[in-house]
């Protein structure tokens, strides 16, 4: 008993030493693999080594299945090299035993006899099929996937790096997160490149296995007849069984490792970082219609005479019953009331952005288009938009609804036959246009022929899921100011502080964060980009000691951003067509400005607001592309008058134009003395 305890203690100590010196263990394994090529091994040791080879290949296959991200096993290319070397060394050892002793151990003999099964021809055919499947189907396919993945990863690396740099400059991510993302991109590129090269090891190992089997059979038959005086039939049977067993001992672990490599290379990890089985079941379960239709097809096959009814009916029921039970459970819940949300979903606060639509409009293309649109708006405005939560209605409908913080702000019916959409002032050129609410412009639903006609005029036409993302873009631009508040401003300031710490500290000394947030909100509500936060913060620091009114601070920031504003409004640099506001209207607005503790507003009568708006609309009918220009102190109040119905019409101040801008005064508007006198009365 004491001897057994002593052996157990020594074994534990030995394992502890090995666990602390993994480098020595790996080096020893590689040296053993090389020694196996040179020295003959006893059959019992060969059985142990074959078992280790099979065990390790099964471990790798299971690890590949349970991986949530291929980069979690970034050493896999090196493992492929090590396992290939080990397997080739083992093949050489077994081949030596087959040719010298016509006995390569129990496992080789058992594999050969099991596959041959008393019929040598069947055994050769089975072995050939296994080898062809591995070489032509699995190995060739994985090699191609690895090659394409490595190439695309390398080609897309600069774009990913630029995207990370853009997010960092905009304050969407901090420096530590950006460093982590860059390392991930580099590691992914190196991993896929290494996998591309490592698959050559697997391909070469398969070819070597085929050659070794042929050499063993031919060489074994010659040795058996010449040296051991065996008959031809006995030699063929003996060495064929041993050669097939030897080949299978190498090909089956190689097949498992090739399958592991294929799972890892073809894996596209999801956002939730789940293993392969979980993602597979969840994604298939999202398409219950396909399972139901498959069950129907199996049942129809079962009804054909001669087909096995019980087998086909069993699998048909196996597919259909879970879907039916789940739907019945949902219908019971909806009939009895709303199902209680999970505990983790009970988060305070309203959801920022919800898109509610018909199931016929929802698709994977829509998700991609919405993500692309969000990134475009971020690049254009500098506002990091929240994720769009898509709510699919249970029944098909033509209605599309957008909700901001659980409140509907936009609703529209999409005609069933309208496969194309035209947005903008030119929408009425092709067909009957429809005016969107809140000054978001005009749209026109088009048929296919009308869409071709619009494209002939050089107009941008949206089709499919792009129709939805384009409408959502209009809504987001109209309500962009609602996505900038104190919390978002603090986030942007924290991101800027990493590179401009003194600038942010001085800004916080000069202005409270609520005024900074209001300034940014007023800028983005008029589609002024806040990407250049350094210039915006610097301007606020310059003017904050002298000006406390947020309206005027915003105007000074706009003047500082005039190059950005003019470049967006007039990218071609042509003379700006100007609609000039007369002095009478400016003085009228200026005299009506009231400052209170609640803020600054105008006390204009509703009649004069209507008159000013009508004058602007009449001028725009004469020339649709006009830029309204007025004094800096009245610009914001005129914008307040027009934004409800003319949201897309920009209003600038003379100071924003500057002396270097080329302008062309197309129209001037003003109120007559009688109309101004009416206001005084």
UniProtKB/Swiss-Prot annotation:
Highest taxon of source: Bacteria
Question: Does Heme show up as a keyword for this record?
Answer: no
Organism of provenance: Salmonella typhimurium (strain LT2 / SGSC1412 / ATCC 700720)
Q: How does it sit in the membrane?
A: Multi-pass membrane protein
Q: Which GO terms describe its cellular component?
A: plasma membrane
Q: What happens when the gene is disrupted?
A: Disruption prevents SpvB-induced F-actin depolymerization in human macrophages without affecting intra-bacterial SpvB protein levels.
Its transmembrane ranges are 25-45, 48-68, 73-93, 118-138, 206-226, 244-264, 295-315, 409-429
Description of what induces expression? Induced following entry into host cells.
Query: InterPro entries annotated for this entry?
Result: FHIPEP_1, FHIPEP_3, FHIPEP_4, FHIPEP_CS, T3SS_FHIPEP, T3SS_HrcV
Protein name, per record: Secretion system apparatus protein SsaV
Q: What does this protein do?
A: Component of Salmonella pathogenicity island 2 (SPI-2) type III secretion system, required for secretion of some type III-secreted effectors including the SpvB toxin.
Q: Which UniProt keywords apply?
A: Cell inner membrane, Cell membrane, Membrane, Protein transport, Transmembrane, Transmembrane helix, Transport
Alphabetically, which GO biological process terms does the record hold? protein secretion
Q: Which family does it belong to?
A: Belongs to the FHIPEP (flagella/HR/invasion proteins export pore) family.
Where found? Answer: Cell inner membrane
